[in-house]
């Protein structure tokens, strides 16, 4: 296996304070505020010797993040200590969600089992990176709250698990419908929870795949801080195979 390490493809969204930060789930904007020491903000511009800020954010609601089964289980199962390696063979696929009218008269945009069967073919990747194509590919700076974003069918996630996909990455706020009554059927299907407690699989949401990157096989580097939490901000990176 030969990989072009000189040209990393960053799939993460930047995290910054204030308006214009990508967010979802009705969370407040990210805050980055200087610690006040002896009545003075710890900012070089204010005369301090260093910049020293506290950051308040939500991993699920502010930008690219990776989560463990702890997201839907009574136990936390920290994502920070899960992985015993950080490089995985990955496949990038582009999918145009199917418009589906609900009983309430709402139009959902659904990634189906058929979509993924066709896109993946006979190749079984360790990691699947899904780029949605739905007329609006902008991700950075978008507030997804209340927009009924596209989502995956539970059957699609169940199938991904059955063929051996370990890491699922997508450019949406969630694998599940924004308002589903708390069912989180796709999350449960991918992790087979509560039947099992799967500590090998992760879901990464709110990535951004550059337009110029073509579908195909890559090496994925999946890194995130050692947070003892069900989710952590992450920086997935693709490398082209040569």
Where are the model-predicted features located?
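Active-/binding-site microenvironments in catalytic and ligand-binding cores
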Residues: 1-242
């Amino acid at each position: 296996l030969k990989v072009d390490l000189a040209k990393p493809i960053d799939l993460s969204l930047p995290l910054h304070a204030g308006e214009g930060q990508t967010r979802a789930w009705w969370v407040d904007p990210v805050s980055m505020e200087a610690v006040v020491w002896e009545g003075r903000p710890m900012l070089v511009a204010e005369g301090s010797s260093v910049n020293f800020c506290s950051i308040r954010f939500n991993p699920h609601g502010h930008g690219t993040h990776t989560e463990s089964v702890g997201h839907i289980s009574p136990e936390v199962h920290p994502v920070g200590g899960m992985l015993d390696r950080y490089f995985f063979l990955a496949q990038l696929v582009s999918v145009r969600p199917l418009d589906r009218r609900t009983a309430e008269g709402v139009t959902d945009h659904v990634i189906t089992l058929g979509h993924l069967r066709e896109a993946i073919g006979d190749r079984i990747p360790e990691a699947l990176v899904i780029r949605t194509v739905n007329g609006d590919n902008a991700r950075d700076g978008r507030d997804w709250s209340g927009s009924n974003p596209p989502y995956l069918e539970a059957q699609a996630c169940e199938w991904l698990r059955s063929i051996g996909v370990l890491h699922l990455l997508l450019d949406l706020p969630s694998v599940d419908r924004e308002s589903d009554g708390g069912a989180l059927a796709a999350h449960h299907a991918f992790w087979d929870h509560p039947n099992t407690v799967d500590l090998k699989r992760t879901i990464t949401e709110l990535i951004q795949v550059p337009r110029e990157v073509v579908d195909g096989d890559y090496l994925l580097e999946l890194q995130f801080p050692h947070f003892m939490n069900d989710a952590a901000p992450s920086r997935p990176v693709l490398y082209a195979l040569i």
